[in-house]
Amino acid sequence: MFHEIVVLLFIFLIALIGKNDLVATAGALLFVMKFSPLSNVFPFLTERGIELGILLLTLSVLTPFAAGDIMPRDLLSTLKSPAGLIAVFSGIVASYLTGHGVELLRSRPEVMVGLIVGSIIGASFLKGVPAGPLVAAGLAAVLIKSLNL
């Protein structure tokens, strides 16, 4: 049990250093859950947590359509502009990478710590913004596969 505590505290601390509130909150919640009856939820989160997260993210992204904030004419104007077409292409690439990221995180969950550390370095020293872990994992998956690692 000691190593789980150390890993969760490490993730929490590096997330705080990197100002990644979502990862810090997740680390803190998992730490609290570890010492409560909620630890019974861990198998479910391991098995279905990524799908649940993607569902919530998808609901968030599609809500403007359901609320009537984005109209069909908005979609058409997006497809007629160069910036809109680049955005569509970027969405396709990001979705492709995310698919590979999900598979990598399922098969090799230990890479999450590397993604967090990389995000902190990029945000702290390269004036970047921490990327979504699934897209970052997708990029890592493509590189790992390309390098046969």
Curated annotation (Swiss-Prot):
A cellular-component GO term for this protein: plasma membrane
This protein's record includes keyword Cytoplasm: no
Membrane-protein topology: Multi-pass membrane protein
Top-rank taxon: Bacteria
Record key words, sorted: Cell membrane, Membrane, Transmembrane, Transmembrane helix
Transmembrane regions: 5-25, 52-72, 85-105, 111-131
Principal localisation: membrane
Compartments where found: Cell membrane
Entry-linked InterPro entries: UPF0756_TM
Keyword Membrane appears in the UniProt entry: yes
Family per similarity comment: Belongs to the UPF0756 family.
Protein name: UPF0756 membrane protein Nther_1957
Organism name: Natranaerobius thermophilus (strain ATCC BAA-1301 / DSM 18059 / JW/NM-WN-LF)
